[in-house]
């Protein structure tokens, strides 16, 4: 894989830390800003909503911009939003900062996905996506637990400042990795925007996006509210939140690595194995959450299965959107973040009921069940190469 691809993954790691770090900070933010844990959890949905709106919008605006300038500008805007968020005492201002950061993240990821696809041959897109998404999984392994520890010791604001600072080496990497003159397809004779937007009418693309959104909704429903499960249900100390996040991240890294090698050639096998296992795993986690060893083991397993299944579906989005070279990345980003926005909202409705802290885990199982029910009648469609794929 080309070196620029790995340097893009460094930037994705910095941004991924921010996207996932709230899983360990929600109780602290709620206490500091005087809101409920459920309300603080909606910061994840606010971020995801910004990603949904920002991905296609910013990608469309950036079609004629040089890729390096676009990526660099997005990183710097992302850092600035975190600096402001770290200093605020207002929850609405913090929400606004998360939305702005999400818009910048969306623009970066949309352009980065398209750039990554352009750096490799067509039959290597799954592996290229795995390298890029490894930045997210490294964030869950190291960045998010590190942020949680920093938040435990110095408060959640220190974690926001740390993310802002970590963006600087990522910006330097983009500055050195991406040639200044490399523009998007729109500036080099690619299809017009209306043609790329027309790809959204393709049933195969819409199906892949829907399934990716449902699986990611299940992931974020549980991940956002994992901290209370670790401390209250399992009875572990606050530092074990970071351990759980490390295990989830390690699992996600393993899952996306294995799926990256299989999703180009054997997507059907990945979906057939990971889907049912993921469905069983969420209820199992809910029923065994009061047993620390079982809880931590299943957190690792669910991280692996969630990212294996999710990354394979997003690879299918990129394949199905082959006729939209500058917008394909935004479609994949939007699909991921529709799920990231919906998941915590669905999970928040289960808090305070008879299921208590375990409600989000049951909600995740329900979301995966819906995904499998939707996918089953179209199982051959989602894993069969589209005509555009077959000719590449």
Curated annotation (Swiss-Prot):
Family annotation (SUPFAM superfamilies): MFS general substrate transporter
Membrane topology: Multi-pass membrane protein
Entry's Gene Ontology BP terms: response to antibiotic
Localization (cell): Cell membrane
GO cellular component: plasma membrane
Stretches that traverse the bilayer: 6-26, 42-62, 71-91, 100-120, 129-149, 160-180, 205-225, 239-259, 268-288, 294-314, 332-352, 358-378
Pfam families according to UniProt: MFS_1 (PF07690)
Chief subcellular location: membrane
One example GO MF annotation: transmembrane transporter activity
Entry keyword set: Antibiotic resistance, Cell membrane, Membrane, Transmembrane, Transmembrane helix, Transport
NCBIfam families: cmx_cmrA
Family from the record: Belongs to the major facilitator superfamily.
Name of the protein this chain belongs to: Chloramphenicol resistance protein
Organism: Streptomyces lividans
Source species taxonomy: Bacteria, Bacillati, Actinomycetota, Actinomycetes, Kitasatosporales
Gene: cmlR
